[in-house]
């Protein structure tokens, strides 16, 4: 079998096709075969409020990317936001957590558009790194220099929303239907 070798949990596997879809870590993984994906990572946060009276059914977002989110069917709001503190974050540190400082930056942006949420209690927050290609366009393609290698990365935090379509596209690529 001619294909790619890869290591997982100390074991070596061989496959005709390997998909690298590991967010920002895709850059690290592909460097092992001489491919450098022009990308970076940035920190995004999310929060959930306590239940609120029904306000609207649409997804919200701002052109400046201050925040995005929606009201769930049971009434809580789920928002993602940029803390605005990106420059002060140590990008070598992987165990980032939201704090009262970073979460409040996102809350101020949200309250600027939805003042009725000023007194809403936040019940949960979390954050994590998102991958971003320098041109803002995700990579979903074969790598000519490494036959059998397919990349799917650089989704700028939109991976969950695009996952069904991307999964179908990747399965078609693996099956040779692209």
Question: Where do the language-model regions lie?
Answer:
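A conserved short coil-to-beta-strand element within the FAD-binding core of flavoproteins
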Residues: 1-4
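Glycine-centered tight beta-turn/hairpin loop motif at sheet-sheet or coil-to-beta transitions
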Residues: 8-10, 64
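Alpha-helix/helix-capping structural signal
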Residues: 24-25, 108, 165
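A short alpha-helix-loop-beta-strand transition element characteristic
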Residues: 37-39, 119, 177-178
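Active-site lid/adjacent beta-loop-alpha segment flanking the redox-cofactor pocket in flavoenzymes
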Residues: 51-149
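C-terminal lid/capping helical subdomain adjacent to the catalytic/cofactor pocket in oxidative enzymes
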Residues: 144-178
């Amino acid at each position: 079998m001619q294909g790619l070798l890869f290591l997982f949990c100390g074991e070596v596997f061989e496959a005709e096709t390997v998909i690298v879809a590991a967010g920002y870590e895709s850059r690290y993984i592909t460097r092992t075969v001489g491919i450098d994906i022009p990308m970076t990572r940035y920190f995004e946060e999310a929060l959930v409020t306590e239940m609120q009276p029904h306000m609207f059914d649409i997804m919200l977002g701002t052109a400046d990317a201050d925040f995005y989110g929606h009201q769930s069917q049971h009434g809580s709001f789920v928002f993602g936001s940029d803390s605005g503190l990106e420059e002060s974050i140590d990008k070598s540190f992987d165990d980032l957590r939201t704090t009262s400082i970073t979460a409040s930056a996102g809350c101020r942006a949200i309250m600027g558009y939805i003042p009725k949420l000023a007194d809403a209690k936040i019940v949960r927050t979390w954050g994590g790194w998102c991958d971003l290609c320098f041109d803002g366009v995700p990579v979903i393609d074969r790598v000519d220099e490494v036959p059998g290698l397919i990349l799917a990365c650089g989704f700028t935090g939109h991976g969950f929303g695009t996952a069904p379509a991307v999964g179908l596209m990747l399965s078609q690529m693996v099956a040779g239907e692209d």
